[in-house]
UniProtKB/Swiss-Prot annotation:
Stated family: Belongs to the phosphatidylserine decarboxylase family. PSD-B subfamily. Prokaryotic type I sub-subfamily.
Protein name: Phosphatidylserine decarboxylase proenzyme
Species annotation: Salmonella agona (strain SL483)
Gene name of the encoded protein: psd
Compositional bias (Basic and acidic residues): 303-322
Pathway assigned to this chain's UniProt record: Phospholipid metabolism; phosphatidylethanolamine biosynthesis; phosphatidylethanolamine from CDP-diacylglycerol: step 2/2
EC number(s) on file: 4.1.1.65
GO BP of this protein: phosphatidylethanolamine biosynthetic process
Sequence positions bearing Pyruvic acid (Ser): 254
Membrane topology note: Peripheral membrane protein
GO cellular component terms attached to this protein's record: plasma membrane
Taxonomic placement: Bacteria, Pseudomonadati, Pseudomonadota, Gammaproteobacteria, Enterobacterales
């Protein structure tokens, strides 16, 4: 009965307005009130502040500053084996496994379409049919920056407007096509392991989704798909990120979905649904043995991310011809 009521609220509540309100409140500097809210949040969700670079909650000017707090360098050691891909986020694995032609497992008995997840981009979907996927859920207590599983060069980014359903076990079991319906940012990379998509999925009260190369992607929420492309290879203006390097962040919420091409990686055998993830720990191994080439990293922000690209509502914002 309680679960039915919670699900009904997902369809009844004004999720967009709640999200805007949460984003507005989380960005405000309110002195002692901000500290009080942070302290209550830390206590309720049992947040481990000893891992943060700034463990004192009084050092955060806004709730957003606290929520995207950077961790100490020593708390997430990076597996440097070039044949191993690492976990992109702290959280829990919701589902993982093989993409069955174009079906991705959402929850037991529930699948959704690869092409729908990729906003109907069948050319991108073709890269991942019969490939491998991992869905990682970030709870409120988790570190909310997202990192690279391996070295990668950005080729394409797509912002897809959508619903803002909460993302949790209950909604995954009961809201059809949840991840293909919610707002999301799709990032396609060329890697030593073939093409890789890293998808940042929004949810209720996820105030914003940001990337290190373009700053805030959403808001604004204008209801249109936006697309940016970059040419192949390394060149002036390309975005090359190293394994373990930050690529984006959530200001509240949510979920990261990784897609890998068929025959390129094998997931670590011990991983399963509900496995706890920590950035830098092994996620998958290459099906080939090689020594990874070095790539120059993009500069990383520490606090605020400055936008480098126009976020005007264009369907196709190309950096260069492809």
């Amino acid at each position: 009965m309680l679960n039915s009521f919670k699900l009904s609220l997902q369809y009844i509540l004004p999720k967009l307005w709640l999200t805007r309100l949460a984003g507005w409140g989380a960005s405000k500097r309110a002195g002692w009130l901000t500290k009080l809210v942070i302290d209550l949040f830390v206590k309720y969700y049992k947040v481990d502040m000893t891992e943060a670079q700034k463990p004192d909650t009084a050092s955060y000017r806004t709730f957003n500053d606290f929520f995207v707090r950077p961790l100490r360098d020593d708390v997430r050691p990076l597996n440097t084996d070039p044949n191993i891909l690492v976990m992109p986020a702290d959280g829990v694995i919701s589902q993982l496994g093989r993409i069955e032609e174009e079906k991705i497992l959402q929850a037991k008995g529930h699948n959704y379409s690869l092409e729908a997840l990729l906003a109907g981009n069948y050319l991108m979907a073709d890269k991942f049919r019969n490939g491998t996927f991992v869905t990682t859920y970030l709870s409120p207590r988790d570190y909310h920056r997202v990192h690279m599983p391996c070295n990668g060069i950005l080729r394409e980014m797509i912002y897809v407007p959508g619903d803002l359903f909460s993302v949790n076990h209950l909604t995954a079991q009961n809201v059809p096509n949840l991840f293909a319906r919610n707002e999301r940012v799709i990032c396609l990379f060329d890697t030593e392991f073939g093409p890789m998509a890293q998808i940042l999925v929004g949810a209720t009260i996820v105030g914003s989704i940001e990337t290190v190369w373009a700053g805030t992607i959403t808001p604004p929420r204008e209801g249109i798909i936006k697309r940016w492309t970059w040419p192949e290879g390394e060149h002036e203006g390309s975005v090359a990120l190293l394994k373990g390097q930050e690529m984006g962040r959530f200001k509240l919420g949510s979920t990261v979905i990784n897609l890998f091409a068929p025959g390129k990686v094998n997931l670590i055998a011990s991983l399963a649904s509900l496995s706890v993830t920590k950035i830098g720990q092994p996620l998958a191994t290459s099906t080939e043995t090689f020594v990874a080439p070095e790539v120059e990293p993009a500069p990383l922000p520490t606090e605020e991310i400055k936008a480098e690209h126009d976020a005007s509502p264009l369907v196709d914002n190309k950096k260069d011809d492809t």
